[in-house]
């Protein structure tokens, strides 16, 4: 399954993990809300594991960060997340999101393979 808009691409892996690629350079609150709404629509509002490539993102506003880190906002229905950032600016942004609530498991990776390996292992163990 695959869905796409010009700025965000969602696909489901063979292992049932959602892979998202963000093509926005700047993420403000409205864009963050749209990304989350698109993700929830893609997953039919079911709980899921997520690998999110934010390598192209260069800026996230404070309001967007707060929304994306909130359990009823950006974290809604995510059981665990692996963030991919392949450049220094995106890596700084990814590290902000890794510092989410303690009961939410998230990690930062510099490549897709490591991110998928980690999230698939968590899913197979039933860990969030």
Task: Mark where each language-model region is.
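Amphipathic, Lys/Arg-enriched alpha-helical "gate/interface" segment within cytosolic domains
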Residues: 1-128
